[in-house]
Amino acid sequence: MPSPTHKNITTQIGCHLEEVAEMLTVLKSDNPFQSMAIADTIASLVLLSDRLKAYGEDTYVREEDRAELLDALCDQIVTATGIGTFFGMNVPGALSEVNRSNYSKFVDGNPIFNENQKVMKGPDYTPPDLTPFI
């Protein structure tokens, strides 16, 4: 079982929200109110993500809420897979490729972290090729 620090946890949650914001950047609408709502949501997620990564020490999940957190994380995985499937994407294959790429960041089997505990790209890093899965 890993032993992450509180900073590691809030940084990881911030990174997760950053990825949700990134997904929303490709969501377009011809309705100006919908476009504004998307832009506002992206801005809010980016702000929260940045704050969690920099100042997350006062943010936490209560022990009694851990089951609810796990349920929400699982639901996010299921719904994210569903979105990709609806677009005809091979999400499990793409996930394997992204994992391969992420592990190529490691040096001697270990991640390299920056001062914010973000995993950095090592010298043997290769980006994921998602083309076959779209």
Where are these regions (language model features)?
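Flexible "arm" and connector segments at domain edges
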Residues: 1-73, 77-134
